[in-house]
């Protein structure tokens, strides 16, 4: 996406859909989608990141003819029962604090950037929101530096967190 942005910097980029296959691997799906879809697309100039599809039945319906027949909805609706799936938590985690009008701001990590992928935003009410994923198999302790004020945090292996400062 950054290559496209660099070639056409005046054009807007939209990451419009990514699906989770059934059956879900909850921890693996959360980690991959937070890293690649939410953090990855936003760090590479996307104005949105959209998980697809929003809702499905236990039979993974409806879907368009020839469309994805094993796409798991963010929620599964079975008559009077609603099941929350990985897509729900991915969307909810990002959308709770990154509200419309938020703008991505620079963020980084002094170690291996693949170990602690992150993305930061400035919200319309002037708060800094940072999404961080511990992408390795051990606990990580790290610092968040906002204008010289340092906060220390830790994440267990595979854990994702949102910081609102």
Cite the ranges covered by each PLM segment.
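Substrate-binding and catalytic surfaces of secreted/luminal carbohydrate-active proteins
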Residues: 1-165
């Amino acid at each position: 996406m950054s290559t496209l942005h660099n070639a056409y910097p005046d054009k807007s980029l939209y990451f419009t859909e990514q699906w989770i296959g059934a059956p879900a691997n909850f921890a693996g799906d959360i980690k991959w989608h937070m890293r690649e879809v939410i953090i990855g697309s936003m760090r590479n100039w996307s104005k949105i990141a959209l998980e697809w599809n929003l809702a499905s039945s236990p039979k993974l319906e409806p879907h368009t003819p020839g469309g994805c027949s094993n796409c798991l909805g963010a929620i599964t609706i079975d008559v009077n029962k609603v099941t929350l799936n990985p897509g729900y938590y991915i969307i909810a985690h990002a959308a709770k604090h990154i509200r419309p009008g938020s703008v991505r701001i620079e963020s980084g990590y002094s170690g291996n950037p693949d170990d602690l992928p992150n993305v930061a935003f400035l919200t319309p009410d002037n708060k800094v929101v940072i999404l961080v994923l511990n992408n390795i198999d051990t606990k990580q302790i790290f610092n968040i530096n906002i204008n010289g004020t340092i906060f220390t945090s830790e994440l267990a292996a595979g854990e994702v967190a949102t910081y609102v400062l």
